[in-house]
């Protein structure tokens, strides 16, 4: 089966538990189609570059999976129906990335908050 990375942005007013439930819904669809989720990352609440459906921020979630094209079509159909998901993107990749994604490495390097240390150094 081919490899896919699916990223979605959830509304800013959702709790973390609700965002996790959305990720579980996607994982459930992948399981129904005999696929396998290799990695799920929650990137947190981030500022959007522009307003999307009156939201200035959004909860970002990325899933890396090995799944069929029919499952991806169903995931995208459900994302279009769900009002809690404001944007999504699915890409087909040659192989899945080992370890944390670039976004997670950036958060770890910044100490999770993205600000400066008390000494004024980054």
UniProtKB/Swiss-Prot annotation:
The keyword RNA-binding applies. GO terms for cellular component: cytosolic small ribosomal subunit. It holds the Pfam family Ribosomal_S6. Disulfide bonds: none annotated. GO terms for biological process: translation. Residues 105-122 have a biased composition (Basic and acidic residues). Residues 99-122 are annotated as: Disordered. Keywords: Ribonucleoprotein, Ribosomal protein, RNA-binding, rRNA-binding. GO terms for molecular function: small ribosomal subunit rRNA binding; structural constituent of ribosome. Belongs to the bacterial ribosomal protein bS6 family. Binds together with bS18 to 16S ribosomal RNA. PANTHER family: MITOCHONDRIAL 28S RIBOSOMAL PROTEIN S6, SMALL RIBOSOMAL SUBUNIT PROTEIN BS6M. HAMAP family: Ribosomal_bS6 (MF_00360). This is Small ribosomal subunit protein bS6. It comes from Sphingopyxis alaskensis (strain DSM 13593 / LMG 18877 / RB2256) (Sphingomonas alaskensis). The lineage of its organism: Bacteria, Pseudomonadati, Pseudomonadota, Alphaproteobacteria, Sphingomonadales. The gene is rpsF.
């Amino acid at each position: 089966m081919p490899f896919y990375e699916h990223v979605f942005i959830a509304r800013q007013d959702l709790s973390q538990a609700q965002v996790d439930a959305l990720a579980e819904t996607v994982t459930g669809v992948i399981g129904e189609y005999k696929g396998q989720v290799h990695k799920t990352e929650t990137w947190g609440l981030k500022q959007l570059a522009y307003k999307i459906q009156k939201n200035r921020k959004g909860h970002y979630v990325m899933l890396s999976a090995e799944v069929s094209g029919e499952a991806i079509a169903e995931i995208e159909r459900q994302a279009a129906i769900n009002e809690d998901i404001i944007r999504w993107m699915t890409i087909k990749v040659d192989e899945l990335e080992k370890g944390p994604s670039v976004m997670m490495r950036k958060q770890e390097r910044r100490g999770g908050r993205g600000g400066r240390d008390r000494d004024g150094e980054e």
